[in-house]
From Swiss-Prot:
HAMAP family: Dephospho_CoA_kinase. Pfam families: CoaE. Its main location: cytoplasm. ATP binds at G11, M12, G13, K14, S15, T16. It is found in: Cytoplasm. Its EC number is 2.7.1.24. Belongs to the CoaE family. The keyword Nucleotide-binding applies. This is Dephospho-CoA kinase. The gene is coaE. It comes from Rhodopseudomonas palustris (strain BisB18). Catalyzes the phosphorylation of the 3'-hydroxyl group of dephosphocoenzyme A to form coenzyme A. One of its GO terms (cellular component) is cytoplasm. GO terms for biological process: coenzyme A biosynthetic process. InterPro entries: Depp_CoAkinase, P-loop_NTPase.
Amino acid sequence: MRILGLTGSIGMGKSTTARLFAEAGVPVYDADATVHQIYEGEAAPAVETAFPGTTVNGKVDRALLSARVLHDAAAMQRLEAIVHPMLRAHHQQFLADAEKSGAPVAVVDVPLLYETGGDARVDAVVVVTTSHQVQRARILARQGMTDEKLDALLARQLPDAEKRQRADFVVDTSNGLEPVRAQIREILAATAKMPQRRA
């Protein structure tokens, strides 16, 4: 089985691209969805211990937690030390299940793939991109998003140009869904011929 790492900066259309891979029959691991899942369960006690007052009714309140860690690198590292081992366990289970199902390709949708060294654990990287103007408009349309929050989020991510340069495949979401579907078909055809590369 070949593993594709799907990544892209916030607002590039990565979630839509992941959904289109899933529609094409490819198993997709969604790191963000897994974070939401563990915040509602297994991570909540450890997060509350490390960041008192950030859980409500036994679940992590993401807005409260974000306010505590967004501008504090040490706090972010403490949070990542709690969450990343749990994410790795879920990720490994997903890959085992995908392999067992006989899927020729699986996609792991990880926002900070390059930033966390995840590109070494996949066979190829797909970077999702769009124009800077479209990206900002998409993000600022989200509830609760501000220019300050957006700039803080982007500061933690590699620039889009660098991600595109390092990518094996680039998917441009600027022109609607049909071009993205066509790009996905091309990627899946190319992936079938690729040697396994991951460590």
